[in-house]
């Protein structure tokens, strides 16, 4: 076989294997092409895409840059380079790539959509809105476009009509692609934001029928009052929810929901931490043994690290723990159910901090008793909660899927667990559907 024919055959075999997900087969075939012709633009391009899929993003960028120097008018290559930058949060570089792709191919579907997404990530909200509208104007039957624009409208509502418009986009996305069940989750939450709870329950009922093993729609049906509310969110629900949410958790919570529980907890602990540092100057051992209980992606870690001798984190979601490992700062991270973990570690910590975790527990008696036992004498527990309005008693599962607690109930269960010096500060710690949610932070001490 002559060289040109052998090269063409190897490239075709590589591309076929690549499309079929056979990366181990495709990579050496692309490299064979490049051995025959070291400046082959398609082999450079597609090998770059493959290396990105394998987590070798820096090498991928080099190969795509080489490909684009050879074929600068290749819209797909510009778009794929933009995708790599986007996934590494280099949003300005991604924007430039997508704009070059669209200058060459104004209807390029992936570049249209991803330009809108990176403009949103860059917090250029008005430009992002226009980009989403342009995407759907050019591709009105794109289910992904309807879903993403609906998500954008819920995250950046200018008025109630935006959320109502989001509902229509979610319905449109599902009509175009009924296999995308994540659309039903977004639709249910949008309807909750509009206080159309019965409609939200109908959506969750439909979702539960389509995906009977998924715990999320079952939990949300209970949250809407259409099934009995559990005493706490099930382990399977928490894992499913947060494993799927881990990669975008920080951006969604901090940017879109105004999440500020970590700093509020540090603020409420300020007198305790100041007293500890004063004691260190008088000869006490430096630092505290601290547990971040329900640590998630580790948002509390940087705030706690400066005060810790040893900083541990525990979470039920392995996906969230992966993000916490990438963030760093913890001496130990453990995948476990929180109450059982605390029960297994008596008198192990000087301070336990729990941000946005008790909202997945209705009844708090067992958890607070376990936290009390896991503290050393004189240790403190600080946590955030969402609260019921006024003098409402007990606890309730809200249509958001999160539990809210009455102030009197919190006081009673803390006292019952043996805590003293309970201090509560009312604070709105996050938004939902554009509105601040009533909540607060609590500091309590285990007596000597």
Question: Can you say where each PLM-predicted feature lies in the sequence?
Answer:
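Conserved alpha-helical positions within TPR/SEL1-like repeat arrays
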Residues: 11-19, 42-53, 76-87, 110-121, ...
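Class I SAM-dependent methyltransferase SAM/SAH-binding core
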Residues: 291, 295-341
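A conserved beta-strand element that flanks and buttresses the S-adenosyl-L-methionine
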Residues: 353
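A short glycine-rich, Lys/Arg-flanked "PGG" loop and its adjoining helix->strand segment in the class I
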Residues: 365-377
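Short, glycine-/aromatic-enriched active-site segment of Class I SAM-dependent methyltransferases
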Residues: 383-403
């Amino acid at each position: 076989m002559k060289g040109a024919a052998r090269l063409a055959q190897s490239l075709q075999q590589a591309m076929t294997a690549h499309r079929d997900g056979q990366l181990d087969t495709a990579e050496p075939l692309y490299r064979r092409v490049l051995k025959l012709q070291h400046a082959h633009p398609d082999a450079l391009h597609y090998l770059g895409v493959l290396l990105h899929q394998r987590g070798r993003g820096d090498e991928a960028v080099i190969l795509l840059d080489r490909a684009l120097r050879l074929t600068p008018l290749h819209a797909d290559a510009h778009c794929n380079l933009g995708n790599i930058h986007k996934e590494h949060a280099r949003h300005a570089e991604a924007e430039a790539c997508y704009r070059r792709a669209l200058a060459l191919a104004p209807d390029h579907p992936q570049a249209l959509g991803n330009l809108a997404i990176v403009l949103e990530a860059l917090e250029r909200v008005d430009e992002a809105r226009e980009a989403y509208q342009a995407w759907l104007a050019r591709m009105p039957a794109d289910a992904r476009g309807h879903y993403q624009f609906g998500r954008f409208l819920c995250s950046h509502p200018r008025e109630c009509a935006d959320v109502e418009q989001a509902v229509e986009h979610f319905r449109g996305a599902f009509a175009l692609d009924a296999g995308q069940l994540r659309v039903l989750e977004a639709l249910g939450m949008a309807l909750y934001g509009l206080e159309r709870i019965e409609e939200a329950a109908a959506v969750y009922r439909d979702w539960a029928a389509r995906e009977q093993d998924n715990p999320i729609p079952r939990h949300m049906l209970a949250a809407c009052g259409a099934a009995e509310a559990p005493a706490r969110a099930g382990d399977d629900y928490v894992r499913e929810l947060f494993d799927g949410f881990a990669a975008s958790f920080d951006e969604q919570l901090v940017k879109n929901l105004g999440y500020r529980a970590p700093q509020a907890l540090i603020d409420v602990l300020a007198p305790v931490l100041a007293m500890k540092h004063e004691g260190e100057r008088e000869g006490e051992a430096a630092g505290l043994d601290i547990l971040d209980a329900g640590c998630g992606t580790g948002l509390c870690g940087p705030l706690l690290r400066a005060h810790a001798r040893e900083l541990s984190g525990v979470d039920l979601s392995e996906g969230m723990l992966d993000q916490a490992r990438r963030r760093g700062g913890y001496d130990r991270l453990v995948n476990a159910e929180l109450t059982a973990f605390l029960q297994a570690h008596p008198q192990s910590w000087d301070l336990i901090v729990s941000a946005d975790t008790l909202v997945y527990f209705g009844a708090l008696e067992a958890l607070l008793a376990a936290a009390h036992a896991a503290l050393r004498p004189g240790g403190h527990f600080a946590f955030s909660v969402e609260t019921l309005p006024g003098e409402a008693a007990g606890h309730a599962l809200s249509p958001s899927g999160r539990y809210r607690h009455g102030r009197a109930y919190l006081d009673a269960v803390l006292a019952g667990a043996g805590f003293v010096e309970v201090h509560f500060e009312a604070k709105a710690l996050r938004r939902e559907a554009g509105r601040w949610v009533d909540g607060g932070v609590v500091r309590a001490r285990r007596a000597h």
